[in-house]
Amino acid sequence: MKKFFLASSILSADFARLGEDTKKAIDAGSDWIHFDVMDNHYVPNLTMGPMILKALRNYNITVPIDVHLMVKPVDNLIPQFAEAGADFITFHPESTDHIDRTLNLIKECGCKAGLALNPATSLNFLDYVMEKLDLILLMSVNPGFGNQSFLPTSFNKLREVRKKIELNSSNILLEVDGGVKLENISEVAFSGANVFVIGSGIFGYTDYNVIIKKIRKKLKNVYSTSIH
């Protein structure tokens, strides 16, 4: 397994050429695709449904797709996204009455399960479900829109979650989403994240190869420092 994973957030891609733009990001070195689903109810925006995910799979997008459900209620959409081709499905604790049951549903559908925490959401939600998690997603902005600035309070929260993961001797992936870019990715990585959701920090550039190469160089330096 790689030390770090880049998940290109297609919320920032060119929707008129979504398949092509997604493929360009992958060819430039993106490991995953991050797929944001918003319902204009749980969050104040409306984005993509299962048919868009299925269309990407039909376009020969084969890398892991990380579906982030910002919807309420959430359970009825999980089988649809699993069938459409999701690898990871992540939801927010506020979107369900039974976190444990929703995690079980994701697993039953054949996907890896994640829990997403907003900037002001307590980490206590993790305490009784760690053994069922494959991924923890920390939001470093308030969800709903792309191209926001990284909230500095997220650094401490990342460090706290990393401690929880290590105390459980777990292989849970720690993902961060919101305002991650070339200028701050080193500090984000040093704080404990190993999956980085990047939207405008990749799609906002003309040449994805150049920016991803620069990001990889920063992460390589973090890795080299951390093993010495």
Curated annotation (Swiss-Prot):
<feature type="active site" description="Proton acceptor">
    <location>
        <position position="36"/>
    </location>
</feature>
<keyword id="KW-0479">Metal-binding</keyword>
<feature type="binding site">
    <location>
        <begin position="199"/>
        <end position="200"/>
    </location>
    <ligand>
        <name>substrate</name>
    </ligand>
</feature>
<dbReference type="InterPro" id="IPR026019">
    <property type="entry name" value="Ribul_P_3_epim"/>
</dbReference>
<comment type="function">
    <text>Catalyzes the reversible epimerization of D-ribulose 5-phosphate to D-xylulose 5-phosphate.</text>
</comment>
<feature type="binding site">
    <location>
        <position position="34"/>
    </location>
    <ligand>
        <name>a divalent metal cation</name>
    </ligand>
</feature>
<comment type="pathway">
    <text>Carbohydrate degradation.</text>
</comment>
<protein>
    <recommendedName>
        <fullName>Ribulose-phosphate 3-epimerase</fullName>
        <ecNumber>5.1.3.1</ecNumber>
    </recommendedName>
</protein>
<dbReference type="InterPro" id="IPR013785">
    <property type="entry name" value="Aldolase_TIM"/>
</dbReference>
<feature type="active site" description="Proton donor">
    <location>
        <position position="177"/>
    </location>
</feature>
<dbReference type="GO" id="GO:0006098">
    <property type="term" value="P:pentose-phosphate shunt"/>
</dbReference>
<dbReference type="InterPro" id="IPR011060">
    <property type="entry name" value="RibuloseP-bd_barrel"/>
</dbReference>
<comment type="similarity">
    <text>Belongs to the ribulose-phosphate 3-epimerase family.</text>
</comment>
<feature type="binding site">
    <location>
        <begin position="177"/>
        <end position="179"/>
    </location>
    <ligand>
        <name>substrate</name>
    </ligand>
</feature>
<feature type="binding site">
    <location>
        <position position="68"/>
    </location>
    <ligand>
        <name>substrate</name>
    </ligand>
</feature>
<dbReference type="GO" id="GO:0046872">
    <property type="term" value="F:metal ion binding"/>
</dbReference>
<keyword id="KW-0119">Carbohydrate metabolism</keyword>
<feature type="binding site">
    <location>
        <position position="68"/>
    </location>
    <ligand>
        <name>a divalent metal cation</name>
    </ligand>
</feature>
<dbReference type="Pfam" id="PF00834">
    <property type="entry name" value="Ribul_P_3_epim"/>
</dbReference>
<feature type="binding site">
    <location>
        <position position="36"/>
    </location>
    <ligand>
        <name>a divalent metal cation</name>
    </ligand>
</feature>
<dbReference type="GO" id="GO:0019323">
    <property type="term" value="P:pentose catabolic process"/>
</dbReference>
<feature type="binding site">
    <location>
        <position position="177"/>
    </location>
    <ligand>
        <name>a divalent metal cation</name>
    </ligand>
</feature>
<dbReference type="GO" id="GO:0004750">
    <property type="term" value="F:D-ribulose-phosphate 3-epimerase activity"/>
</dbReference>
<dbReference type="InterPro" id="IPR000056">
    <property type="entry name" value="Ribul_P_3_epim-like"/>
</dbReference>
<keyword id="KW-0413">Isomerase</keyword>
<feature type="binding site">
    <location>
        <position position="9"/>
    </location>
    <ligand>
        <name>substrate</name>
    </ligand>
</feature>
